[in-house]
């Protein structure tokens, strides 16, 4: 009986402990069995491109931000669609830095120390749509930017010139951000933006320009020129902007708006003229068909005319105002005729008072 029991327990004693196999184990096992089956066949690796040291790679997104990098990492995965290099110490973008990145759609270079971009650095990026160059030391935007670009953001640099050649062929750009640069009106070449047929949004805020740039494309729907040194608005500055819906001119030194200027922007819906030197409400608001929001607070407006905001007749079609700000002006609310706001149906839409 003891002999029979010993024979039954012997296989159990000799058995190895159970080990749960993962995917990696099976891959190794398959690789080993393949080697045993044929030693002449080449070994094909199952791993994808190697992620650059200290970077993180996931689903074709390569994140190399906040690493103190002084140059673009080498051997970036060729299937990368988004490359994040922000918050580093990169000083130069060289030819070949982005070789093989034919599928890159977005490149983030924000908050580095970039002062130079080689002429052919972006040449391989045939599908690049978004280029973020803000918070660097660039004095000019580079030429030969990819024709596929739809969005360029380069605020907070040292840009003092905008040449027409830089934007030539950039027919797909929709958004252009160039604020907080030491840019002057004399540094913007006449018609610099004319070739940008799809440009819809442009922001040149907090610079030293003294007038609205000339030759802006008619495709514009938003123009933001806040925080500059513009002293007046003339009709020529807004000429041809028939699709403009939002115009930002706050925090300038504007003291006058030429008669007829608003006729050049017939589809305007928002006008921001707060924090300027205006002494009267801009002419043309009453006859403007679509304007709904007008910011005029923090100016020097001392009186409101009965037809400044509303058309002469009651039967004239006009969009309803949703916001009119007049606070922090010398005009007193009791000096304003109630009929001056006859086309405004909501009392809360008008803000008056608080002048010191």
Swiss-Prot record:
Predominant location category: secreted
Signal sequence residues: 1-15
Intracellular or extracellular location(s): Secreted, Extracellular space, Extracellular matrix
Highest rank taxon of the organism: Eukaryota
Molecular function GO terms recorded: extracellular matrix binding; glycosaminoglycan binding
Gene3D superfamilies in UniProt: Ribonuclease Inhibitor
Propeptide, residue positions: 16-29
A single GO cellular-component term on record: extracellular space
Listed PROSITE patterns: LRR
Keywords per UniProt: Disulfide bond, Extracellular matrix, Glycoprotein, Leucine-rich repeat, Proteoglycan, Repeat, Secreted, Signal
InterPro entries referenced in this protein's UniProt entry, alphabetically: Leu-rich_rpt (IPR001611), Leu-rich_rpt_typical-subtyp (IPR003591), LRR_dom_sf (IPR032675), LRRNT (IPR000372), SLRP (IPR050333), SLRP_I_decor/aspor/byglycan (IPR016352)
Disulfide bonds: 51-57, 55-64, 310-343
Family of the protein in this entry: Belongs to the small leucine-rich proteoglycan (SLRP) family. SLRP class I subfamily.
Quaternary organization: Binds to type I and type II collagen, to fibronectin and TGF-beta. Forms a ternary complex with MFAP2 and ELN.
PANTHER family on file: AGAP008170-PA, DECORIN
Function text: May affect the rate of fibrils formation.
Protein name according to UniProt: Decorin
Organism the protein comes from: Coturnix japonica
Top-level taxonomy: Eukaryota, Metazoa, Chordata, Craniata, Vertebrata
Gene that this polypeptide is encoded by: DCN
